[in-house]
From Swiss-Prot:
Record: residues binding 5-amino-6-(D-ribitylamino)uracil: F13, T45, F46, D47, C69, V70, I71, L102
A Pfam family per the record: DMRL_synthase
Gene Ontology cellular component terms for the protein in this record: riboflavin synthase complex
Gene from which this protein is expressed: ribH
Example of a GO MF term: 6,7-dimethyl-8-ribityllumazine synthase activity
Cystine pairs: none
Name of the featured protein: 6,7-dimethyl-8-ribityllumazine synthase
Superkingdom of this protein's organism: Archaea
Length: 143
């Protein structure tokens, strides 16, 4: 089986944390024998879906990993951002028939908790690679 090609969409808001997530995700992809072949950085988590859609439209990746960090503020804004981004990301996965995995930490956490959850990126990369392989195996069985 050829190398799994991943796209990665990374939110720049809370960049100190999403930078660590991006690096961990890329390292884990390499460890799994996959390749992060495309990266788009967007201003914030709410902006992730449009970049995911562009990446899926190009068709050069097998899956997309969404990386973001939503930290709790004074209002419920963090919950709205995380819920809407997650929902649209799932919709895009179904629309294009390719895995789009969620490496977005939050909502309802502070900066310390966010730093402790940078491994969400590794989990999202692993889920993307496994899902690509399993869907290809399933397609091959049905032939």
């Amino acid at each position: 089986m050829e190398k799994v090609k991943l796209g990665m969409v990374v939110a720049e808001f809370n960049r100190d944390i999403t930078y660590m997530m991006e690096i961990l995700g890329k390292e884990h992809a390499e460890f799994l024998g996959a390749e992060v072949s495309e990266v788009i950085r967007v201003p914030g988590t709410f902006d992730i879906p449009i970049a995911v859609k562009k990446m899926l439209e190009k068709g050069r990746v097998d899956a997309v990993v969404a990386i973001g960090c939503v930290i709790e503020g004074e209002t419920e804004h963090d919950e709205i951002v995380a819920q809407h981004a997650a929902r649209k990301i799932m919709d895009l996965s179904l629309e294009y028939g390719k895995p789009v995995t969620l490496g977005i930490s939050g909502p309802g956490m502070g900066r310390i908790a966010a730093t402790e959850r940078v491994d969400y990126a590794k989990r999202a990369v692993e889920a993307a690679v496994k899902l690509v392989k399993r869907l290809k195996e399933y397609d091959a069985e049905g032939s």
